[in-house]
Amino acid sequence: EFRNISKVGYMLHNGGLEFKKISETEYEYRTTLKDFHMNAAGMTHGGFIMSILDSGMGTSAHQVIDGVAVTITLDIKFIGASKAGDEIIGYAKIKKQTKSLIFMQGELKTSGRTLATAEGIWKVIK
């Protein structure tokens, strides 16, 4: 079952994310797009797509270590478009974990269509 993970700060201000654990290495997260997430062309702003991926994948890293990790790299490929009212579902998968690093893959979808994919590395802080 999804639970709200946005208690304070940037993501709460921007609509929040709900999150759920699928397995020890896989997580899902979701949000619904609002008008203020759109760019001048009426599509979701790329910066917000990046924020959803960073927040969802970062929260997944935090869950795996039960601590804090920060983004070192995040490589995003924009594939499709979305609009206000769309529910965005994010998927995060832990590919490898060392004592100090977490390597992940992510994907965002709406209505079964891929919007973006990502690969990233998170540094374990504590």
Q: Residue spans of the language-model regions?
A:
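Terminal targeting signals and extreme-terminal segments of soluble enzymes
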Residues: 1-126
